[in-house]
């Protein structure tokens, strides 16, 4: 198998609504050699990856995939690769991974192998190891071009993968918080490779670092980290704490020991996880040795009175005791046969034990502390303990040093509960681990004694979510409920705008409407990321990384995200779901790139945000491919947009109570109207929207309708929608490269980024309407600077020229700055040839390769009353060229409002007749168009 491409998707994508990895592979000879015809292959594979027995595949029960491997000729290697990658991730600890699919690509023997992942690095590594294993098990003649490693050690590689996965995985505490958030449908983002996690989006977000939250006070952490100060602060309010001294020298330690009296505890001033702690000391020699051990972790050392009793961790969250665990130091139990060292090995065989915090329990170690306790007990590592004898190889019950935990939450005495809550409140911690020593947690400390030895600002949750004995406690849920109280939002409203043409203008319109409504808008477009109207990052920012940048910004109250085809194909959507999503149109552009060759395939890509939107999808009812997307949507509402007031399906949809935005004709113009739940809301006359050039720019009329429909679905007030549309203009500063009009010395220039046939057609139609209506006062010749991106299909470049042919007096054909794989003059020459083929005289056409020179030449040719349309690639440079020729922007006459048309949807209008092969589907959202599976 040869890998042609590797790609990972971070959100909803063409294959699934969750993260997946895709390997594109060429099977070569394996295309004709499925699993069952390769001698010994299946047995060797199942022996190496026994987890495959659990895969049901098409049979839906364990063992189903093994049947597929053996039955008839078996199954193909791409399918096997998919299942092995899933099984290896499961073995590496990614237990939720179960999804996979293998689909043929365009070429014979080439397949897309797709499978789910939890952690991207682990998913990729599992894929690579799966390939190596399959190549190792297959005969060399079936793997031409693949270098075989004669020393390949699969189990060794698998162990490396497991260890690497454990290092990269979220720790037990952080992982439990993430799971609790997912259970509450709260989105989360991992902000680094460790334990920094963001819950929620934008202004609604909260963050955690392990179990420290964004609500945790810094001064409280400082106090809890200072053991001496903690002891003093708690003692000052009458809480039970041991007497304590801080020392820096051995002689000071001995003097403090005499004052306190034996037995004693010696511990570092500011260490954690039980490091350097020695308890139950009864001699000066033990104190000196313990002092020096503690000095390895802290310059200052604490001595305190020893409190007898069991070690308990009491977890307080938001001033409530949520869990208590009795911590038992790491120990072994003799059996009369094994040595202590062998008993330690036996304990470490427990699959719950791992290194550090990677699992719910930590491995035991025979280190210096264990040796001290062995010596104190008169034992060595080779001692055989009598059956039933318990020997502690740790003096503290920390889980990080091999201890175990017993849940005792339900038996805690009320006095002890109140004491723990007071301790956390005294220091000021929202999440606090109270280390409390007492002989019996079910009896009051006031009766039998006890004391608080420490407070922890970042307490571990392992002992509570997965105790060795007793009931697991949802302590992570308590933290998430504190950060996001009941009914508190965790998401900001998200709008996703996709389609072929009009995305950027619609995105900017919608963002402007929200800004007028008082929101702090985060916006992604093809020219950059904007936060509250200010450019934050420049460039094409329409992919998943850009979306996440906006959603991470804590100042943003609403996210308006332009969603382009490229980002969806490369990495997916980048977040779980938008509230509102729209598809403006599906038109010929980018075909022949990244495996997308037809408009129907392009529609599948554009449909991704539509499928996952939660509240409303807004679809172009005048585009059949957009119309068909509605049936795939799970959103609560479907809103259609149409320029045709007699659209039969939309009228039927409105009669059913569905949502729509329609263009209605009145006596003095055209009115944008909103229909929702039986209501008819006249919104705004099109000639009052500056971006439409008095209603002449129909593509911007449509963009305004989409912006209005989305804003209405997002709960924006009608007056704010009207105000936003009336104050949005297509100036260079509000919408660069989107129908920017400039008046220079008596002639007009229109600058646009149109780069496909549909966009060029829209602008040429606008020019026709403007000239016909004399809206810009132009009566001279028309000039067009024409170009097309080099990575488009030949037929698309030809079509671009064809739609412009015959509509201008002169043409200047240029290329974009980047030829995108074509010769320097190839695109301009193709445009010229296509113009001439469409009837344009050669004398009307000029070839100027450089965009900069082409624009200068066109500007020089313009005279009084002329109109120049420039399709530019480098928008900012071209705009500078234009403004250097003159000043003054086109002034538009004040529009005169007309009477409300008062158009209504007639009850007796004929029903919509679906096209052949399709059918009408009705549900609570209105009327939808779907494929008729039963049609011939």
Over which residues does each language-model region extend?
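Walker A (P-loop) phosphate-binding motif
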Residues: 211, 486-531
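Residue-level signal for inorganic ion chemistry
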Residues: 181, 435, 524, 562, ...
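Conserved N-proximal alpha/beta basic substrate-recognition cap immediately N-terminal to
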Residues: 114-259, 272
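Flexible active-site lid/hinge loop adjacent to a nucleotide/diphosphate
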Residues: 535-653, 688-693, 757
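ATP-dependent carboxylate-amine ligase
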Residues: 9-41, 46, 50-52, 57, ...
């Amino acid at each position: 198998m040869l890998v042609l491409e590797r790609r990972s998707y971070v959100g909803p994508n063409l294959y699934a609504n969750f993260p997946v990895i895709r390997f594109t592979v060429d099977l070569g000879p394996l295309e004709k050699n499925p699993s069952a015809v390769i001698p010994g292959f299946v047995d060797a594979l199942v022996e190496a990856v026994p987890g495959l027995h659990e895969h049901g595949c098409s049979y839906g029960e364990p063992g189903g995939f093994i049947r597929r491997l053996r039955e008839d000729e078996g199954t193909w290697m791409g399918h096997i690769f998919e299942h092995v990658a899933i099984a290896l991730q499961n073995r590496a600890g990614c237990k939720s991974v179960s999804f996979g699919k293998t689909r043929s690509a365009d070429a014979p023997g080439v397949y897309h192998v797709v499978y789910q992942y939890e952690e991207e690095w682990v998913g990729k590594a599992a894929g690579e190891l799966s390939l190596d294993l399959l190549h190792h098990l297959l005969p060399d003649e079936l793997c031409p071009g693949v270098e075989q490693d004669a020393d390949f050690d699969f189990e060794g590689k698998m162990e490396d993968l497991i260890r690497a996965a454990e290092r990269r995985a979220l720790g037990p505490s952080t992982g439990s918080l993430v799971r609790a958030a997912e259970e509450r449908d709260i989105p989360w983002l991992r902000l680094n490779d460790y334990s920094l996690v963001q819950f929620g989006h934008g202004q609604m977000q909260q963050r955690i670092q392990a179990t420290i939250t964004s609500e945790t006070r810094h001064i409280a952490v400082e106090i809890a980290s200072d053991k001496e100060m903690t002891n003093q602060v708690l003692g000052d309010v009458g809480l039970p704490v041991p007497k304590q001294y801080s020392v820096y020298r051995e002689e000071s330690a001995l003097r403090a020991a005499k004052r306190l009296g034996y037995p004693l505890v010696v511990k570092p001033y500011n260490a954690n996880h039980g490091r350097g702690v020695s308890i139950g000391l009864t001699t000066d020699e033990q104190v000196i040795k313990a002092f020096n051990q503690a000095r390895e972790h802290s310059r200052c050392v604490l001595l305190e009175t020893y409190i007898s009793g069991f070690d308990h961790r009491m977890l307080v969250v938001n001033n409530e005791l949520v869990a208590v665990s009795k911590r038992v130091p790491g120990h072994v139990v003799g059996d009369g046969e094994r040595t202590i060292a062998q008993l330690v090995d036996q304990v470490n065989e427990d699959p719950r034990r791992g290194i550090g915090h990677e699992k719910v329990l930590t491995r035991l170690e025979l280190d210096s502390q264990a040796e001290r306790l062995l010596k104190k007990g008169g034992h060595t590592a080779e001692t055989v303990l009598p059956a039933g004898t318990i020997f502690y190889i740790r003096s503290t019950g920390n889980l990080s040093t091999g201890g175990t935990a017993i849940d005792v939450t339900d038996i805690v005495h009320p006095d002890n509960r109140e004491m723990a809550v007071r301790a956390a409140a005294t220091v000021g911690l929202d999440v606090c681990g109270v280390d409390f020593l007492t002989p019996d947690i079910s009896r009051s400390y006031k009766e039998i004694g006890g004391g608080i030895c420490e407070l922890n600002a970042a307490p571990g949750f392992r002992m509570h979510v997965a105790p060795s004995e007793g009931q697991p406690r949802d302590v992570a849920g308590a933290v998430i409920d504190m950060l996001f109280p009941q009914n508190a939002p965790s998401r900001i409203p998200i709008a996703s705008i996709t389609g072929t043409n009009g995305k950027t203008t619609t995105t900017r319109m919608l963002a402007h409407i929200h800004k007028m409504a008082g929101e702090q808008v985060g916006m992604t477009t093809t020219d950059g990321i904007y936060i509250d109207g200010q450019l934050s990052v420049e460039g094409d920012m329409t992919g998943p990384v850009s979306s996440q940048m906006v959603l991470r910004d804590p100042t943003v109250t609403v996210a308006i995200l332009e969603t382009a085809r490229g980002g969806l194909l490369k990495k997916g959507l980048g977040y779980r779901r938008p509230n509102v999503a729209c598809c403006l149109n599906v038109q010929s552009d980018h075909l022949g790139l990244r495996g997308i060759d037809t408009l129907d395939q392009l529609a599948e890509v554009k449909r991704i945000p539509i499928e996952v939107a939660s509240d409303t999808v807004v679809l172009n009812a005048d585009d059949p491919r957009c119309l068909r997307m509605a049936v795939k949507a799970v959103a609560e509402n479907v809103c259609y947009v149409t320029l045709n007031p007699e659209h039969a399906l939309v009228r039927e949809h409105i009669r059913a109570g569905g949502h729509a935005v329609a263009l209605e004709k009145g006596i003095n113009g055209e009115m944008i109207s909103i229909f929702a739940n039986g209501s008819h809301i006249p919104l705004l006359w099109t000639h009052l929207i500056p971006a439409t050039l008095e209603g002449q720019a129909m593509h911007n009329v449509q963009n305004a309708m989409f912006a209005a429909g989305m804003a209405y679905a997002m709960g924006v007030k009608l007056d704010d929608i009207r105000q936003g549309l009336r104050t949005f203009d297509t100036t260079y500063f509000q919408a660069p490269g989107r129908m920017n009009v400039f008046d220079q010395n008596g002639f007009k220039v229109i600058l646009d980024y149109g780069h496909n046939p549909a966009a060029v057609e829209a602008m040429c139609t606008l020019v026709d309407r403007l000239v016909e209506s004399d809206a810009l006062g132009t009566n001279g010749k028309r000039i067009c600077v024409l170009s097309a991106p080099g990575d488009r299909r030949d037929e698309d470049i030809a079509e671009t020229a064809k739609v412009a042919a015959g509509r201008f007096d002169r043409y200047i054909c240029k290329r974009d700055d980047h030829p995108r794989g074509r010769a320097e003059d190839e695109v301009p020459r193709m445009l010229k040839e296509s113009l001439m083929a469409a009837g344009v005289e050669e004398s009307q056409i000029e070839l100027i390769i450089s965009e900069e020179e082409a624009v200068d030449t066109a500007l020089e040719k313009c005279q009084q009353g002329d109109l120049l349309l420039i399709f530019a690639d480098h928008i900012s440079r071209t705009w500078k060229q234009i403004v250097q020729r003159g000043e003054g922007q086109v002034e538009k006459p004040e529009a005169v409002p007309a009477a409300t048309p008062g158009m209504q949807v007639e009850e007796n209008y004929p029903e919509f007749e679906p096209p052949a092969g399709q059918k009408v589907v009705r549900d609570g959202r209105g009327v939808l168009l779907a494929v008729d599976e039963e049609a011939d």
